[in-house]
A protein has these predicted regions:
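Solvent-exposed, extracytoplasmic
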Residues: 71-85, 156-193
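A generic secondary-structure signal
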Residues: 42, 46, 64, 80-81, ...
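Extracellular/periplasmic ligand-binding regions of membrane signal-transduction receptors
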Residues: 37, 41-42, 46-75, 92-106
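Extreme N-terminal signal-anchor transmembrane helix of membrane signaling/transducer proteins, especially
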Residues: 1-26, 30
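Extracytoplasmic/periplasmic ligand-binding sensor regions of membrane-associated signaling proteins
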Residues: 84-86, 90, 95-165, 169-172
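Short, hydrophobic-rich beta-strand element in sensory/regulatory alpha-beta domains
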Residues: 58, 87-93, 179-182
């Protein structure tokens, strides 16, 4: 009888231990999931706000460009806007990705996708880009205004930020800087890493 009682006691302790470990594991999982959802929600809201704000700026710049043709005035306006908002570059952009800056610099803005289709729909665009020898950037593109600047025919205007600046904005103190950040499209393509 004492052996059966000890065996029963051991089985009860083992059963309670398994239930307790299961309970603790589930609690930790729920807390971790809740915290991660909170962090991701915060980052998502900050990214949405950044996109909304920068596309609004682009629409304001378009209004200015529609009413002004003086190159010096345009350059002064864009330089002041750059100081106020902190974007890296402002581009007059053609449908094929070629650009001209307000200072007259030309080149190809290495975009991840074909602009032609999106510009023809008149949609605002946010996409990853890179210039030779420079870090990756996030470009905000607005096709609202078409025109010519210094003889360069453009189909849209764009501003860009270096990805590290965008990630600093999105960085949360939740992981004390020990996390990797990715911004992805719904189809899984990485926008910022």
């Amino acid at each position: 009888l004492p052996v059966a009682a000890i065996l029963l006691l051991v089985l009860l302790i083992a059963g309670f231990s398994v239930r307790y470990i299961s309970f603790v594991s589930q609690t930790i999982y729920q807390e971790s999931t809740s915290h991660l959802e909170e962090v991701l929600h915060k980052s998502n809201n900050m990214l949405k706000e950044m996109v909304r704000k920068n596309l609004t700026y682009l629409h304001l710049y378009n209004d200015f460009l529609e009413n002004t043709s003086d190159e010096a005035e345009i350059q002064a306006y864009i330089e002041a806007a750059q100081q106020d908002t902190g974007f890296v570059g402002f581009y007059f952009l053609s449908y094929d990705g070629n650009y001209m800056t307000v200072t007259g610099e030309t080149g190809y803005l290495g975009l991840q996708a074909n602009l032609d289709e999106k510009l023809s729909k008149g949609e605002d665009i946010v996409m990853n880009t890179a210039l030779p020898g420079k870090p990756q950037m996030l470009a905000f593109i607005c096709p609202e205004t078409q025109g010519s600047y210094r003889g360069f025919a453009y189909d849209a205007v764009a501003i860009s930020y270096y990805n590290d600046a965008v990630l600093r904005l999105l960085d949360s103190s939740a992981f004390e800087g020990n996390a990797s950040n990715y911004v992805i499209y719904p189809d899984g393509r990485v926008v910022i890493d």
